[in-house]
Structure formats: C-alpha cells, structure tokens
Amino acid sequence: MSVLNLSKDSIKGMLVGVNFDAIKISAHQNREMISPPNNYIGDSFRIFVECGLNCVRIPFYWESFEKDPNGFIKELETISEEADKNGLMCIYDNHQWECSSFLGHGIGFPNSLLSIAFQRNPPNGDYWDPPIKIELKKFWSQWWDRKLANSENKDGWELQQDLLQIVIDKLDNKKSTLGFEILNEPQVFRSSDFKKVSNYHNFMVENLRYHTEKPLFFSYVFSNSIKAIDFPWRQSRTGPTTKINNKFIFDIHPYPPHYVVLLYYKLVSILMKNDMIFVGEFNAGIKKNVTVNSNQHLRYIKRFLDFSLYGATFWRWSYKPDNN
C-alpha cells in the first residue's frame, strides 16, 4: 500500500480506498486471534491518507458484537474519530464470510443463532477448516425462509436489524460516515432465493430509513449451487425495491476486475434500474499467494473510472494473515 501515490486528478472525484480489518469489531467468537501493533488504527489511517486514499470500508461482524459488545462499540467510536481526524469517508459493512466461525474458518453470524439449529463444526473445536457445504446450504436456505431464531424464538432478520440499528445510531452523525452496507455477500443455493434476498433487503431498509438518511449499500449475491446460477436477470432481482429517500448503491466484488466481469455487473445494474455501482472489494484474484503491484492497482482504478463507478475499496489492509 505504501507504494501508492494517488492524486485527486488521477481519481477524478471517485471514492478510492481499502477494506480495513479492525480488532474488536472483527473478532472471531470461537477462536482467538493475534494482537495488533500499537496504535494500529491511527497509524493505518494516516498511511491511507499519505497514499491518496479517501475512503475506507469497515467490515464489522455480528459474532464480534456478541463476543464483546462494549469493546465492539468502543472500537467503532475510535475508528470514526480517526476517520474524522484524517478526512476519510467510511462505509460500515455488516460482513460475513463463509457464514460463521461456529461452522468452520468463516466469520459473521453469532453463536446465539447457529447453536440452535446446528452442531458445532468440527466438534473437536478446530475452527480452521472450511465449513461443510451441506451445512452452509442448510443455513442459507433457513435464513431466506426466516426459519432461524435465537433461544427466545426471536427471528434472525429482526435480530440482525437490531444490530444494524445499534451501529447506525452510534455512527450516523459522524462527518466521516458515508453509509452502511446491509449484508456482505449473501449466498443462495436455490433459484427461488434470489427474490427472497430482495424481500430481506426490503425488510431491512423499511426500518433502517428511520435511523439514517445516508446511502444504503447492498451486496451482489454469491451463488453456491448449480441450481442457482446467477444469470444477470436473477441477480437483478436481489436488490431492495421499497421506495425510500435513501440512495441504494450496488456493491460488487470482482476478483479480478476484468472488463467482461464489470460488463456483467453493469448489465445487472441496468436491469435493476440502479446505475450506482460501488466496488466494495477487488484484488488480482482469490488464489493463495496472489500478488498485486501498484501498476496493476492503478490499471484497475482507471478501469473503474472508465465504467463511471461510484468508488472502489481494495481487499484488504490487515495485521493478520488472510486465510482467504
């Protein structure tokens, strides 16, 4: 990251930044992680500004909030204060990857929701292996069917909405807060789920509009089954359709951002009748040991400018080894 030197002229007003892997708001509920360097947040944000970045996407995790609510909120306050101080804009992203650390090496959904319907995977307590696909299918199918609840029988959608309200109420009045993302990379295993994702988005925004007037980001849907091929017309059915005053911004994750991949998402946005596209994540690929240099990064930024995108945040800045 330190080799970048973006100028305002080179990015032409586009939001350009990085995903920031924090500490308390990205803590796994079922395993311990290494400690960060001293003053990790403040030093990182100063480096971002020195590199010419103007935007930071902040992934936070439901299971991290359940693990340490006070530490979670305190760290959000620290992040927003540092962003205010450094003139950075923040998108707060309700993130999940591979569902939850309860099922394996992923992170996202909390034990209070998973423990009701699932056995710990694996039972020996080693949470570094990928989750079993049949368990992922069970989770996401039940999530879209609204069959997941906590021990008090409160619906999962309502519980997640409660978390988003807490985060929004804490951060909405900060000058550095650009907007909020409803859920990162939701997965589908059935063709009927695409429309259910839209129902979920509508459920969320119909309440969140009373807590913020800022833009609401919604992620592209990840198809995890041949029975749910993500044709553009299917992907276009996943966005929120409720008419509210908040802007809706379509978040895409091209790995890597080839021209044809961006064309696909452009077509999806046209079918959605929503021309605001944000690249919430990008990199040179997803294989292990993939590398990207400053020249590649600048070529990607130029390509995003050619497509008139709202902005882009590189995946990712972290003090931890990336297991993906």
Regions found by a protein language model. Give the residues of each.
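N-terminal carbohydrate-binding accessory modules
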Residues: 1-55, 78-85, 89, 269-270
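Structural motif
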Residues: 13-15, 53-55, 87-89, 175-177, ...
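A cross-domain feature marking catalytic cores of carbohydrate-active enzymes
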Residues: 20-22, 58-62, 92-96, 181-184, ...
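Surface-exposed, active-site-proximal loop segments in enzymatic domains
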Residues: 26-33, 62-74, 101-114, 138-152, ...
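Extracellular glycoside hydrolase catalytic/binding regions
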Residues: 37-38, 148-310
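Aromatic-lined substrate-binding rim segments of carbohydrate-active enzymes
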Residues: 40-117, 167-171, 194-217, 297-307, ...
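Short catalytic/ligand-binding loop motif for oxyanion handling, primarily in non-cytosolic enzymes
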Residues: 64-67, 98-104, 108, 187-191, ...
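Aromatic-rich peripheral "rim/lid" segments of glycoside hydrolase catalytic domains that contact
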Residues: 78, 108-117, 125-144, 239-245, ...
